Amino acid sequence: MNGATVQPSYKEAGPVRYHPMHDCLSLILRLLTLGATIAAIVAMLKSTQTVPTLLGPHTARWKDFPAFEWFVIGNSIVLVYAALGTLAACLSLFTRRGPLSYTKTAWLTFLCDFICSCALISAGSTALGVAWIGKHGQHSAFWNAVCPTVDRFCDYVQGALIATLCGFIFQALSTVIAASALHNLATHRH
């Protein structure tokens, strides 16, 4: 120790720093996912319509289609997860140590985000298939389009599908944020 100072090496990994941007983006995206799934569920639940026909009243309900039931269930699952994720993101903003700060919980967050994204796109695409046939019919199977008859029902279903697509985009972006947090944790590992 003859007065020589040791220069720090810039190639060494430093301590893991807190990244408030991950938590802020995560909170915003989870709130948007929450709002989109609520809108999709409410629109689908309000989509019942009864119209008079020659054979008596005809009621179009989401409960009559298994694809629409899965649509409501899938959106409900993501709604619960988004609500819990929003709480976790709020806590991580205040405590500076949230689920994206530790490797194990960041992996769990990433996997849950990915599964919820898959559930949303599955529910949305299944309902979209039924809605497409309802709007355009299937001429080779002699299925007529029902949307000219129950137009309000179809409008609500269309709104729910648009909300689910928005929810999927927000949930997929949450998955990207979780993957980015995992990348930061992996590159700053000692």
Curated annotation (Swiss-Prot):
Residues 46-70, 135-158 are extracellular. It is a multi-pass membrane protein. Pfam families: CASP_dom (PF04535). Keywords: Cell membrane, Membrane, Transmembrane, Transmembrane helix. Its main location: membrane. Residues 1-24, 92-113, 180-190 are cytoplasmic. InterPro entries: CASP/CASPL, CASP_dom, CASPL. GO terms for cellular component: plasma membrane. It comes from the Eukaryota. It is found in: Cell membrane. The chain crosses the membrane at residues 25-45, 71-91, 114-134, 159-179. Homodimer and heterodimers. This is CASP-like protein 1U3. It comes from Physcomitrium patens. The lineage of its organism: Eukaryota, Viridiplantae, Streptophyta, Embryophyta, Bryophyta.
